[in-house]
């Protein structure tokens, strides 16, 4: 295990995206600023997703434009497709995240694609990020358990993680989406994952 860990705060994106009452831009910026002031060095600010799907994050461009960027803080964003990537680049975002899941049912219900289709959708996004010197995090949800399919075998999650990493992600986020992971399962999955030392 590494001697240190890096915390990535996703509250401004993941925490707010399902709120029914629209949070004003100023309040979102104040939230991000408070997190940075607390010492967090990477904050996922928003998502460049279709406003039709996530109205709460329709103001992503506005939030990034008005945010006071601190030199020692990475401000990242979730980017689901090329349209979102173009918006992120226009805002000067220097790190993005793409999102899929280890189970087919969760993929279909959450992003309306199969796992394979999600990887195909991310290929041009990651390539464009690399062309522009933008770092990429790959999210893998339901790595331990799925609300629809139950327990996920470590081998299944490891194969999905490998395919996500092979897109060119600089780091992987392995998600315990429904909160059922236990030390033996975590150890089993991490033991199957191989990731270059220059990536995390």
State each model region's role.
Residues 8-10, 94-103, 137-141:
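Non-cysteine beta-strand/loop elements that form the S-adenosyl-L-methionine
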Residues 41-66, 99-114, 144-148, 173-184:
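Glycine-rich, proline-tolerant flexible connector loops at the mouths of alpha/beta enzymes
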Residues 56-57, 87-92, 148-157, 182-193:
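Distinct, well-ordered alpha-helical segments
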Residues 15, 35, 88, 96, ...:
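Conserved, mostly hydrophobic/aromatic
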Residues 7-28, 72-82, 108-115, 142-156:
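Active-site mouth loops of central-metabolism enzymes
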Residues 25-73, 79-87, 92-93:
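Glycine-rich, positively charged N-terminal anion/phosphate-binding segment
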Residues 3-6, 39-41, 69-75, 93-94, ...:
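Short, well-ordered coil/turn segments that N-cap beta-strands
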Residues 53-77, 116-138, 161-162, 185-200:
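Alpha-helix-loop-beta-strand connector modules within alpha/beta enzyme cores
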